[in-house]
């Protein structure tokens, strides 16, 4: 009896002990808690850390996932966080001989899409407010500043929403996404805001709005200005026009261990161009980021690009990949600004969901890349761990959505982002027959 109890994974044990307020939470726990548990197994988290992370997800994230999908599989609130509107993701970061688990989700409620909350803003406000007491450093000054700048009163939002005929744009216009990093005994919360609705309302470019909102912090923005100027110069450059790069959203930390003025600010760009030369142009902000470290970074980026993307034989660096039919296919970048830094740190998100190889071939490519980096921890055996975590009876349960790359110090900084295949996780009686009854 005791040995059977020891085999119960933390996600299942917590569900038995804590239960759920409704069937929607039960559904989201099944499709979110389980792959997260598997990812923590991969990252060698201790049992106590698994319970800590999962308890946080159970209390603060699962209730914000909103109603479960409709019987036909459609999401209650369509959003392009993932290509099929899945509003959750799990991820694992590899850097400096460590593996760190992360999550991301777009808070949703029953009011989302109604006249009470037409563009889905309320759930994010409620979620951040509920977490305020978790750590002394959870200062909401920046959150209030940016939501005041970009969240829109319901009366005005209802008018904007009614006037917008292109619903693809509406799904891209994510007002707020929350993500969480879980290093040892810590929780780091990041908020991402897309000012697309505000841009449509005031008829100003999103990049202009983002830069202005950061400058509007006044004295609190002083330490960001050097790096911000580099990004602003690129936004207004011919290189940005040629590469099709445009600012799409920005992010900042809220849950800090020290003063809010030490937060990072990240500005994200997107492009639909997939030529490798174009990737390098944007990654270097049109050559504004240079030097020996950047040369090493672009060399390693090429290796990862070749290892994971479905590149036709003979494709030149100045040629684009065959176009994806998916409406939001493209490449994302972010530029991380630290207070006092002269230049931002670049990151690129390789679009596996749109232009990547098959998942197991991506896993092979990641193995090759990791070996080339000299990484040899147990969690660096990428394909073996990926199969153990996310392949069951020959079916892929979590697909690669993106793989991000940046370069810090002397090494690559890699994060793999996964989209749970909800239809594979959705039958609780199959996945946890002892817990959920058919």
UniProtKB/Swiss-Prot annotation:
GO biological processes: paxilline biosynthetic process
Record: residues binding substrate: 102, 190, 264, 266, 268, 349, 418
EC main group: transferase
Organism: Penicillium paxilli
Keyword terms, alphabetized: Transferase
Sequence positions that bind L-tryptophan: 80-81
Name this polypeptide is given: Indole diterpene prenyltransferase paxD
Thermal dependence of catalysis: Optimum temperature is 37 degrees Celsius.
EC number: 2.5.1.-
């Amino acid at each position: 009896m005791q040995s059977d109890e020891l085999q119960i994974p933390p996600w299942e044990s917590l569900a038995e002990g804590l239960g759920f307020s409704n069937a929607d939470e039960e559904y989201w726990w099944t499709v979110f808690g389980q792959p997260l548990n598997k990812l923590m197994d991969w990252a060698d988290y201790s049992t106590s850390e698994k319970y800590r992370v999962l308890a946080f997800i159970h209390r603060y994230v699962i209730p914000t996932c909103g109603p479960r999908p409709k019987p036909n599989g459609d999401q209650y609130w369509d959003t392009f966080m993932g290509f099929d509107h899945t509003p959750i993701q799990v991820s694992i970061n590899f850097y400096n001989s460590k593996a760190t688990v992360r999550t991301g989700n777009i808070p949703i409620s029953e009011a989302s899409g109604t006249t009470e909350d037409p563009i889905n803003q309320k759930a994010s406000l409620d979620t951040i407010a509920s977490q305020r007491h978790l750590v002394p450093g959870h200062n909401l000054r920046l959150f209030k500043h940016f939501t005041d700048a970009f969240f829109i009163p319901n009366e005005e939002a209802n008018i904007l929403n009614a006037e917008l005929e292109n619903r693809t744009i509406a799904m891209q216009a994510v007002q707020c996404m929350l993500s969480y990093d879980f290093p040892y005994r810590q929780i780091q919360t990041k908020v991402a805001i897309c000012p697309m609705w505000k841009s449509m309302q005031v008829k100003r470019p999103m990049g202009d709005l983002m830069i202005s909102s950061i400058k509007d912090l006044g004295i609190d923005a002083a330490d960001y200005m050097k790096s911000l100027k580099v990004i602003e110069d690129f936004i207004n450059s011919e290189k940005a026009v040629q590469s099709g790069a445009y600012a799409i959203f920005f992010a900042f930390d809220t849950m800090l261990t020290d003063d809010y003025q030490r937060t990072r600010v990240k500005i994200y760009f997107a492009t639909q161009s997939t030529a490798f030369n174009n990737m390098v142009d944007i990654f270097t902000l049109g050559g504004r980021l240079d030097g020996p470290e950047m040369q090493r970074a672009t060399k390693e980026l090429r290796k990862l690009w070749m290892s994971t993307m479905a590149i036709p034989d003979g494709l030149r660096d100045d040629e684009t990949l065959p176009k994806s039919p998916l409406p939001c296919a493209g490449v994302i970048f972010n530029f991380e600004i630290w207070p006092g830094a002269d230049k931002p740190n670049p990151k690129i998100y390789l679009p596996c969901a749109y232009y990547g190889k098959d998942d197991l071939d991506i896993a092979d490519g990641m193995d090759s890349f990791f070996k080339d980096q000299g990484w040899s921890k147990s969690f660096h055996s990428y394909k073996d761990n990926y199969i153990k975590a996310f392949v069951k009876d020959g079916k892929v349960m979590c697909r690669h959505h993106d793989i991000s790359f940046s370069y810090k110090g002397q090494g690559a900084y890699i994060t793999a982002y996964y989209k749970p295949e909800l239809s594979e996780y959705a039958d609780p009686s199959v996945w946890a027959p002892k817990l959920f009854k058919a």
